[in-house]
UniProtKB/Swiss-Prot annotation:
It comes from Chlamydia trachomatis serovar D (strain ATCC VR-885 / DSM 19411 / UW-3/Cx). InterPro entries: Tir_chaperone. Belongs to the chlamydial CPn_0713/CT_663/TC_0034 family. GO terms for biological process: protein secretion by the type III secretion system. Pfam families: CesT (PF05932). This is Uncharacterized protein CT_663. The lineage of its organism: Bacteria, Pseudomonadati, Chlamydiota, Chlamydiia, Chlamydiales. It comes from the Bacteria.
Length: 133
């Protein structure tokens, strides 16, 4: 089901490139030059949408950045129901879990929502000025 959702979404977006996979088998979405998005299904059949925001530079006030992320996470009010966090390499990520059985329209809405919030958080945290992986 996930593969079909992704292929339909990529076709809808007009992305001509082949779908890529990363080391953990996640689909890598080539839909934004600022945000690297990944989509996979977990063992509970939920769809996990993640947006890589980048490394918080050492020149930033790390405690202030972390506090801002925690404020944004409160009740999902500034994340659209997603969660901000750090991956094992210390990079900021935005992650959203959605039901595995989702319509094509809802899937597209979830992807667009995560992308929009991710781009807003890039700006909020000042990461849009740093180089993304």
């Amino acid at each position: 089901m996930l593969e079909k959702l992704i292929k339909n979404f990529v076709a809808y977006m007009g992305v001509a490139s082949e779908l890529e996979f990363d080391a953990d088998g996640s689909y890598v979405f080539p839909i934004s030059s600022l945000v690297r998005m990944r989509v996979r299904q977990n063992a509970d059949e939920e769809i996990i949408i993640s947006a890589f925001l980048g490394e918080i530079p050492a020149s930033m006030d790390i405690e202030k950045a972390y506090a801002r992320m925690m404020e944004g996470n409160l009740f999902g009010q500034e994340t659209g129901g997603a969660a901000l966090g750090l991956d094992s390499d210390g990079h900021a990520v935005l992650v959203r879990r959605v039901p595995g059985e989702v319509s094509q329209e809802d899937f597209a809405s979830y992807i667009e929502s995560v992308l929009n919030y991710a781009e807003a958080w890039l700006e909020d945290l000042g990461l849009s000025k740093t180089e993304q992986e």
